[in-house]
Amino acid sequence: MARNIGLNVQPPVEECQDVNCPFHGNLSVRGQVITGKVVSDRMLGTIVVGRDYLHYVRKYKRYEKRSSKLHAHNPPCLQVKVGDIVKIAECRPISKSTTFVVVEVQKP
């Protein structure tokens, strides 16, 4: 039985025993919710999410394209592959560089 995490997302069908799962563990989510594309899934339990955004340059009164990569924890109950569009939510720091967790997978 998945618990309500306070976001408008569908809980996963599978269950897991991960302590850092927002649905089946003790991890609470708060703060930003970001959508991005999975760039890498080679780390154990962690994925890299890339996102593109526009940044305004005042001098030229134009926008420039920028990109960033974020590390996110990947719970075992969500099957995430490279190329998937995922929704990640901010949480407490899980490791040195991981402060987000995957909450929803939207297939490409």
Swiss-Prot record:
GO terms for molecular function: rRNA binding; structural constituent of ribosome. Keywords: Ribonucleoprotein, Ribosomal protein, RNA-binding, rRNA-binding. GO terms for cellular component: cytosolic small ribosomal subunit. CDD domains: Ribosomal_uS17. One of its GO terms (biological process) is translation. It comes from the Archaea. The keyword Ribonucleoprotein applies. It holds the Pfam family Ribosomal_S17. HAMAP family: Ribosomal_uS17_A. Part of the 30S ribosomal subunit. Belongs to the universal ribosomal protein uS17 family. NCBIfam families: PRK08572.1, uS17_arch. This is Small ribosomal subunit protein uS17. It comes from Methanosphaerula palustris (strain ATCC BAA-1556 / DSM 19958 / E1-9c).
